Amino acid sequence: MSEGTVKENNNEEFNAYHTLTTEEAAEFIGTSLTEGLTQDESLRRLKAVGENTLGDDTKIDYKAMVLHQVCNAMIMVLVISMAISFAVRDWITGGVISFVIAVNVLIGLVQEYKATKTMNSLKNLSSPNAHVIRNGKSETINSKDVVPGDICLVKVGDTIPADLRLIETKNFDTDESLLTGESLPVSKDANLVFGKEEETSVGDRLNLAFSSSAVVKGRAKGIVIKTALNSEIGKIAKSLQGDSGLISRDPSKSWLQNTWISTKKVTGAFLGTNVGTPLHRKLSKLAVLLFWIAVLFAIIVMASQKFDVDKRVAIYAICVALSMIPSSLVVVLTITMSVGAAVMVSRNVIVRKLDSLEALGAVNDICSDKTGTLTQGKMLARQIWIPRFGTITISNSDDPFNPNEGNVSLIPRFSPYEYSHNEDGDVGILQNFKDRLYEKDLPEDIDMDLFQKWLETATLANIATVFKDDATDCWKAHGDPTEIAIQVFATKMDLPHNALTGEKSTNQSNENDQSSLSQHNEKPGSAQFEHIAEFPFDSTVKRMSSVYYNNHNETYNIYGKGAFESIISCCSSWYGKDGVKITPLTDCDVETIRKNVYSLSNEGLRVLGFASKSFTKDQVNDDQLKNITSNRATAESDLVFLGLIGIYDPPRNETAGAVKKFHQAGINVHMLTGDFVGTAKAIAQEVGILPTNLYHYSQEIVDSMVMTGSQFDGLSEEEVDDLPVLPLVIARCSPQTKVRMIEALHRRKKFCAMTGDGVNDSPSLKMANVGIAMGINGSDVSKEASDIVLSDDNFASILNAVEEGRRMTDNIQKFVLQLLAENVAQALYLIIGLVFRDENGKSVFPLSPVEVLWIIVVTSCFPAMGLGLEKAAPDLMDRPPNDSEVGIFTWEVIIDTFAYGIIMTGSCMASFTGSLYGINSGRLGHDCDGTYNSSCRDVYRSRSAAFATMTWCALILAWEVVDMRRSFFRMHPDTDSPVKEFFRSIWGNQFLFWSIIFGFVSAFPVVYIPVINDKVFLHKPIGAEWGLAIAFTIAFWIGAELYKCGKRRYFKTQRAHNSENDLERSSKHDPFEAYSTSTTLQSEINISVKH
């Protein structure tokens, strides 16, 4: 590739620099390894590719945002309602609706502002300065001026300014948790070159360093290969910017098809029918439907008057149209969600976007990062193998820093490999190993000195410190997480580093916490070991070692630890033959040790080896000693292999229980991690994400359940869609792998949540239907990209969020049913009312416009809020997730809406006609839709009766929909008395109770207060008509109870006809049972038995 090409496209097409040697990379990008770029060339490239930033600060277009907030179906219905309210001079209702519109617009402004903060938080991650070589000279420049081809120098404490192909490394480690989510530093090696035919994930490209990663050790030099949005961190920023995707430019379609698709998308976005959460999309579609029904009803009214439209006909048409608009719906929805968000705070869940609350009820898949989310993000020693001594296991340790927690046991003589393949079952596990060790209560045929040698090595080949903070009385640690895990075990065995060296650690424990071993060994007033030299961990050799002088026996000792292959290459002997004498290490011995390494690795443990050697002053002269302490190769030769340790990042205590409850609630959990596949698989099995008995499943299923990021990314969309099951574990995955997983779930019509805490999780957090970030350890970027933040970083808190989401969805369904049933009742009632004609042949209002608004906005609003506060049903988390496609508008809800609406219409119409023709003379008068005159007495009194009936029926309906099937009088069948049960039902939700009482009482002043009654509401005080209102309200209650009784009988019959299927749904199965070969075999056996 020519320099010109490189300049123009910033190498965005080429992503395989890890497969090139340093010389090939320099030639490819057009730079000199020694001289770097010239000033002229760097300026030319800067002009061509742009500054090394993640884009300009996102500006908020307030006008566009306000327009976007107003121009959707729900808000437009509110605007129309507001206009109608002001048209009929109902200033209070108009003012309330205006306030709701303003709140919605304000929420939109706040959310857009937070979205801008998300991007700006990412942009601030980049390093402000960079050290580069140009014209053969080292200079410091602003990081935004770095261009592809620059030779960049980085050292400890620097933030890498761009993606680099490393050309020199010296003990170079970087923190890539921003990209991979893994907390352990990554050792880099410039000399590595990966094969072009093999797939290498971002986290495994050890010859590259990535923009915004922190240098934690050493120094390095590299060629800048990617800048700005083309870097790995830039790809995350680009994905967070989003794309409206409203304009279709599909080359496979004609311009006419693209135009039609674009028009549909733009219209849907304008009305809110194809954006937002499922509930908001459904409500937007409902609003559009109700809008056109309202228009149709208004036309019907005018048609009934032969389109002779005067002011009264227009008002009647507006009244009928208004009856179809649930004006208080958005008010109640917003307030209910706000209250729900406040409740969530007390359950350690912070809701950033109210929409996400109802979305949680539909979640059926959760994709979670591992490190720090499912696990503690800290390392813990789990198994130790010392040849001929046995295997030490550490269990029940919850605090990785606390050496006083956990049980230590010994499996004498057995290695991990032998123990895992033992069929006898009785291996003689010794509990309380520490007490037995110091009481010398161990089997006679094992040598305690083997453990003492290993423990000394583990303690001294280590620079981490573990101490008890006097101020907080808590155990703390400093150092590398791996070394901390080893040092905690050493402290647990009463042999901390400072006990042997005499070094002081900050806030170290008092004398009572000091080791019994150290008290036994250490001479008064002097340290046993004196530190001579250290060979630090090197990414090339993958080990470290320390040289100490033992003041007690006057010997020099070299203690080493590191990756197994690295340590074993330095060893020439071990104690593995008889546990007493040092014997040469043969190839067969190495293979035996390697089997144990694999055995520990298969349990998800990170395995390290330990070795040592010692010699006296008499065995070396001064020159030889100097060579040993200064020459790594000499010091780390002819070591004696001592044993292995397996450490791991333990799951959070509550994770397994949370996963089990998610499965019980019909929610699948997927682990997407940057860790190695063995570790990820073991943790997933430990917490229940994967089944432990994988041998019960076909190989195809097992291969689909567990994949690496490279394997998953290597599949086409069609191949992913053809998988029998989407991966439950993806190891070594990149940010784009997580995004692809979310996309795959969406193609399977799954409604998913994504949890995470790092910058690398941000794109998937944003793409998921619900993004859940961690509040304590989460980055600002992940929080800003999320919908929900867990304030305690507790995976189990997601259960609280899901439960609250389901409760809220249930309650939203209840008050939507209540409000829409009232709309149906009012609309039918007013349409039927067209048959009532006055003496001039004009239709008479059976309800006035203000009466309609009063019932919709005032009477129904507070009970609807009360329904939004209903407690969760006992079986809420035993049900399957809500259907995100159907949402709250199930067939049952739709039928209930019309059923209750028709019953209410009948009751109100009976009350109106009973009053008009039964109690009164039946005269309809003239001009009774405007101002009162003497001929309107009967109409005005009948309106009062109908108004009271509809008001009270609406309130009774609120109680009836608390449970969609149970009788209101049998809500709590466990109560010992029907009277107690009734009062328990009405008093259980006190807000709802007082709302209904207020609604009942409010009917009286509205009917009796002068001026307000006849001038505003167009009705008059009544007497005997109250009896009719009460009677037909009771009739409505009876009708509603009979309808629910019919529903119960119907569903009972359905269950009887589908008993086997119902039993299948109600049982709590292993979520993996459908894929088990043993289940398939059992099904075949059952079928054969039946036949």
UniProtKB/Swiss-Prot annotation:
Q: Binding of Mg(2+): at which residues?
A: D369, T371, D757
Catalytic activity annotation: Na(+)(in) + ATP + H2O = Na(+)(out) + ADP + phosphate + H(+); K(+)(in) + ATP + H2O = K(+)(out) + ADP + phosphate + H(+)
Cytoplasmic-side segments:
1-63, 112-282, 334-815, 870-885, 965-991, 1043-1091
Keyword annotations from UniProtKB, A to Z:
ATP-binding, Cell membrane, Ion transport, Magnesium, Membrane, Metal-binding, Nucleotide-binding, Potassium, Potassium transport, Sodium, Sodium transport, Translocase, Transmembrane, Transmembrane helix, Transport
Can you summarize the PTM annotation of this record?
A: The active site is phosphorylated in presence of sodium or potassium and in conditions of higher pH. Not phosphorylated in presence of calcium ions.
| Miscellaneous comment as given in the Swiss-Prot or TrEMBL entry | Present with 606 molecules/cell in log phase SD medium.
Q: What does this protein do?
A: Catalyzes the hydrolysis of ATP coupled with the export of sodium and potassium from the cell. May export potassium less efficiently. May transport other cations such as lithium. Sodium/potassium efflux ATPases are involved in salt tolerance and maintaining the membrane potential across the plasma membrane in high salinity (Na+) or alkaline (K+) environments.
| Designated name of the protein | Sodium/potassium exporting P-type ATPase 5
Organism the protein comes from? Saccharomyces cerevisiae (strain ATCC 204508 / S288c)
